A protein has these predicted regions:
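An N-terminal-biased, well-structured beta-alpha scaffold segment characteristic
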Residues: 1-92
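Phosphate-binding beta-alpha-beta segment of Rossmann-like dinucleotide-binding domains, i.e.
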Residues: 85, 93-121
Length: 121
């Protein structure tokens, strides 16, 4: 069974889904030096924006096949280094659509009710 490291907090439902097909270890807040030490034993890495996956981490990843980003961007992953090593980098670009829509509506309501002006007074 493949091993997946979840290095940033994700919802328990995501961990439950991963656990159906892999052995999942949740170790959040690992410093880069520690991640370099533990990454060789994992086939997959699940991150959010907190974990920076640099060239050193990718080079240490002897079994890694995939890096999954729970969120929109992959700017915290050295994608060229991962690609050279044959590691697939994926993200979930539609993961924040509801939150973004809610925020946009809240901002529109705030402007229509003059909340910023009231806050300044």
């Amino acid at each position: 069974m493949p091993k997946v490291l979840v290095s940033d907090s994700i919802d328990q439902s995501g961990i439950d889904i991963l656990s159906q097909v892999a052995q999942v270890d949740v170790k959040t807040g690992l410093p880069a030096e520690e991640l370099v030490k533990v990454i060789p034993e994992y086939d997959g890495l699940m991150i959010r924006s907190g974990t920076k996956v640099n060239k050193e981490i990718i080079e240490a990843a002897t079994k890694l096949k995939i890096i999954g980003r729970a969120g929109v961007g992959v700017d915290n992953v050295d994608v060229p280094s991962a690609t050279r090593k044959g590691i697939v980098v994926v993200n979930s670009p539609e993961g924040n659509t509801i939150a973004a829509a809610e925020h946009a509506l809240a901002m529109m309501l705030s402007m229509s009710r003059h909340v910023p002006e009231a806050n300044q007074s």
